[in-house]
Amino acid sequence: MKIISINAGSSSLKFSLFNMDDKKVIASGLFERIGIDGSSYTIKYNGEKIKIEAELATHTDAVKILLDKLVSLNIIKSLDEIDGVGHRLVHGKDKYKESCLITDEVVNDLTLFKDFAPLHNPANVLGIEAFKEVLPDVPMVGVFDTAFHQTMDEEAYLYPVPYSWYSEHGVRKYGFHGTSHRYIAKTISEKLGRDNLRIISCHVGNGGSITAIKDGKCIETSMGFTPLAGIMMGTRSGDVDPSIITYVMEQEGLNAKEVIDILNKKSGLLGLSEISSDMRDIVGVINNDDEQGKKARRAFLKYTRTVTNYIAQYYVLLGGADVICFTAGLGENSEPFRKKVCENLACLGVKIDSEANKVMGEFKKISSDDSTISVYVVPTDEELMIALDTLKLIS
């Protein structure tokens, strides 16, 4: 059985084709700059990689080329081999608590909820409509980023604002990266042979969120009404005093949208360091005895402190923790980042194994044997999680 996992952006379409018999990727790729000059696509398969410039006016054009190439490159013999298509969907509000078969109602809801994810939900609809046109008889499944967090109770998801903001306008914590956090919880539970774990999952890439998981369910998460809340990130501020917005509007002569744009795109590591949004660039100059080194250190220390603070908060919320998991670009690959966060948690009995912590992108325990909390690097695989959900729902 073969399933395609799809992540459709406003001008891009990322795919992975899985053979569900062994859960392996047969082919993957990316269609870029859809509807923009200079569009192209990349396909990786069988140890090879091709990149071709092509006119991609619409997402449907991209899907047609994708399916044509899967056959012409002998990746599959015919389109009949494709049993299902799983779509990453960003925002399902509190209506969608788990993955579901995509129906007209789902598509209508994605459009209805577009104000909650104005960049992503309309793009997700474009991806769905493209596959619907080209593969009309193949079932499609929607996997929502927000779904995993719908097990939070009111105490966790309500904001201390007028209740009517929630009841009338849907203002509440939704959380994101849910598919990744769910994959981490599933993987670590399977590896350790336990379902009743208290897990603190740290998805830290250019965007980042921390999630408290108990018995496989989300109890609390750091991102909120939007992905701007929570820990400091590559270009996002994370939590700030909301009064800063009106103050900066007055001081800089900006409107609210412009300030929010700065908090989303010019803050975080980039804003504090004035060097880069990439932790590798920060770590590269952090020991310099100059102004750049000073800037890098202040950004690194603030970043790791915000992550530490959420882990410590969730340790208390869960009544302790059995395991801390690091995942995504930074979590999987940055030895200095993990080392500093774990050093900050020493008062909880967390101890790092320096040699094990050198691991990059592999599943590995990085805490020492006498650490009171086990710490693991767990590579995430949202595409596989989408494929697994699709398989389950179409079987």
Regions from the PLM with identified roles:
Residues 70-120, 141, 147-156:
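Short beta-strand-loop/turn "lid" adjacent to the catalytic site in phosphate-handling enzymes
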Residues 148-251:
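Glycine-rich phosphate-binding loop of actin/hexokinase-like ATP-binding domains
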Residues 322-345:
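Glycine-rich phosphate-binding loops at beta-strand->alpha-helix junctions
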